[in-house]
Amino acid sequence: MRTSKYLLSTLKETPNDAEVVSHQLMLRAGMIRRLASGLYTWLPTGLRVLRKVENIVRQEIDNAGAIETLMPVVQPFELWEETGRSEKMGPELLRFTDRHVRPFVLSPTAEEVITSLVRNEVSSYKQLPLNLYQIQTKFRDERRPRFGVMRAREFCMMDAYSFDIDKEGLQKSYDAMHDAYCKAFDRMGLEYRPVLADSGAIGGSGSQEFHVLAESGEDLIAFSTESDYAANIEKAEAVAPTAERAAPTQEMTTVDTPNAKTIAELVEQHGIAIEKTVKTLFVKASDDVDADIIALIIRGDHELNEVKAENLPQVASPLEMADEAQLRDLIGAGAGSLGPVGLELPFIVDRSVAVMSDFGTGANIDGKHFFGVNWDRDVQLGQVEDLRNVVEGDPSPCGKGTLQLKRGIEVGHIFQLGTAYSEAMNCGVLDANGKNVILEMGCYGIGVSRVVASAIEQNNDEYGIVWPEAIAPFTVAIVPMNMHKSERVKEAAEKLYAELTAMGIEVLFDDRKERPGVMFKDIELIGIPHTIVIGDRSMDEGNFEYKNRRANTKEAVEMANIVEHIKAQLS
């Protein structure tokens, strides 16, 4: 590709509204342009990368036995009513009506559509197992689109759906897709981790996320120092302490704390160790509980895991914190002074709190706390659950090593849906005995456009993008110095360009009438792995200059050997 016949829309300055590195560099490298909030046009350079990611994903998913199809972006609303997800998805599901006032949605995912297709097309166990996938545009009406294509409203996604006669078959399909994901991300040259995850709005049982490790990642992932265990922060289990609860050494006393409305203020003003405090959080109770709200009690230095809390049968979904008015009406005190002692509402205690003794907690009176509180003496312990986020150094749930925390960007997710959708939509087949069996489903997604941004977050330097070779927009750049003034430079560049392209190598030939400094900066910004600089001075010595983008090195290579040198770099 010649730059004179290409849309090379690089920018010198970083746009003010670009927060993360990938967004900044995608704009500066001329990969994308914003059309509206969360909507982006992919320019030629960006599209080349996107297509490479797509093709790697397609090849590995094909190799796993899946079959490509293509489903509409517009879906009938009635399908979403069949599964009950029309309400669960909330405002992210964009709804509209056509000219006949028939309701439709823009596809955020395609479980309903694919299940409808399979129930009409597949009738016998002999047609199974079946795994269908597509690479298609999706739309989710994000409340706050940000970070460029990392969290856009419209995005490109590979979504696959497997159908099996039993759970054993589902496990095989799931494992095959897990392996396909690993092969795809390995080929892309990404540092990633598959982690245990919560199934969320998709539903089902077992699930794993695939995270590209990056400091800018929105998600925290926990992994063992001595095993393959890894989970996202929502799923990671906080193991129950093995030590028994110490015997009380203090009597419970009431302490005036008029200026301590937070744990931090309590610790600072009254000298109590934060590990000896508990905080009591109130959330809306489910319909099964004989109370409007329920208390969740965690240690003062820990954070509530909202997903774990929402998964408790006593807690309403979605999770909703009680407001100040509710607390004052039901308890008579504000949020900073609440605790379990004397509380006439149900409460659930975190595992770490269950082994505490002589701790401090709110007295359910404004401006007062109890110190020296002990379970079973001052208040009955009751139900104990895992309520908190894990922290660095916690024991690993696998029993090996401790947990480390790193930030990651979720680029893929695989689910064992079971019969959650197939039962709701009556998707079954006749088995070998002629009996109707509801199908076991799996679903699998890769955020193709998000992979592009994630790769940049992981691969960049002060000069621009440093692409893994497999997904770079071009493999080699040819930069001829003053070719419009030097005939031999032009001839050498044209000859080399013809040779490399004939070999199937993707080359960007910078034939612009630009200053060398501008050309070099653009090539580095775009992140092309290999650059060949052709100039009169080096040719006088019989050489071309070769630059390796990732190693940030350059060397003189004999003109006659340059093609073999490039071939060696690519092998």
From Swiss-Prot:
Reactions catalysed according to its record: tRNA(Pro) + L-proline + ATP = L-prolyl-tRNA(Pro) + AMP + diphosphate
Matches recorded under PROSITE patterns: AA_TRNA_LIGASE_II
Record's keyword annotation contains Transferase: no
Keywords annotated in UniProt: Aminoacyl-tRNA synthetase, ATP-binding, Cytoplasm, Ligase, Nucleotide-binding, Protein biosynthesis
UniProt superkingdom: Bacteria
GO cellular component, one term: cytosol
Intrachain S-S bonds: none
Keyword hit for Translocase: no
Enzyme class: ligase
GO biological processes: prolyl-tRNA aminoacylation
InterPro entries (UniProt xref): aa-tRNA-synt_IIb, aa-tRNA-synth_II, aa-tRNA-synth_II/BPL/LPL, Anticodon-bd, Anticodon-bd_dom_sf, Pro-tRNA-ligase_IIa, Pro-tRNA-synth_IIa_bac-type, Pro-tRNA-Synthase_IIa_type1
Main localization category: cytoplasm
GO molecular-function term, one example from the UniProt record: ATP binding
Subcellular location: Cytoplasm
Family: Belongs to the class-II aminoacyl-tRNA synthetase family. ProS type 1 subfamily.
Comment text on domains: Consists of three domains: the N-terminal catalytic domain, the editing domain and the C-terminal anticodon-binding domain.
Function per UniProt: Catalyzes the attachment of proline to tRNA(Pro) in a two-step reaction: proline is first activated by ATP to form Pro-AMP and then transferred to the acceptor end of tRNA(Pro). As ProRS can inadvertently accommodate and process non-cognate amino acids such as alanine and cysteine, to avoid such errors it has two additional distinct editing activities against alanine. One activity is designated as 'pretransfer' editing and involves the tRNA(Pro)-independent hydrolysis of activated Ala-AMP.
Subunit structure: Homodimer.
Annotated protein name in UniProt: Proline--tRNA ligase
Record organism: Aliivibrio fischeri (strain MJ11)
Encoding gene, per UniProt annotation: proS
